[in-house]
Amino acid sequence: NINDYKADINNKNLKYTIDIHNIKKYFYWGTSVLITQIIILWFTQPKIIIICLLYFFISILYNYYLKQKKYFDIFTISVFHLIRIYYGSIAFDVDLSLFFIVFCGSIFLMIGANKRLVEIYKKYENRPYNFDDKRKIEILQIIFGLIAILIFLLYSLNEKKNIYFENGNIIYLNLVIIILMVINFLNSQKNNHQDIIEFVFKNKINSVLGILFFVIFLSNSIFL
């Protein structure tokens, strides 16, 4: 977002530069890429055009309005990720369950809330939050984490899921791992205040738990 460039230089110690005097050039270039993409999709994947246009519209709305609105910005970030997942499900012809959508949405909301909490601690410029909002966001991220755990628990208790696994009870082991990952994330971020990308690459406990989750989940799946 060109509008946040100056603030991001200070917030994130960016090493690259952008000629902000050529905003029109960036706009025309981005518009050209979008139109080209729409034309290609019109002939190859017409169903995805609506998704791309929706994503583009929300992006504009977020960058120029919602990003400066408390809590709406967190929700919008989650929507971005859900749209990408839906896009991928169409591209690979995969059906998404309600459990999966709500679970992912809750995780994205937890991460989004934590991202804003980190920005408060680091005193980022051009953000709608201040230190007085810290406690509210801390509670929000915990609530979203608990909702994600609850959704995975409900999925584990759902007997319909058994047709997708060799052993329906092993899924409870995945539930335990999810609980540990959420606890590890919240506890680690409480002490370190890392950007989510930095957390993913540096937190070894989370990496081990994540790998263990997928190994158990996929090895128990009837599709492999």
What would you call each of these model-derived segments?
Residues 25-92:
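Intramembrane alpha-helical segments
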Residues 1-3, 46-62, 104-106, 169, ...:
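Membrane-embedded alpha-helical segments that form the functional core of polytopic membrane enzymes
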Residues 4, 73, 183:
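Residue-level signal for inorganic ion chemistry
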Residues 1-34, 67:
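Aspartate-rich (DDxxD/NDxxD/DxxxD) Mg2+/diphosphate-binding motifs
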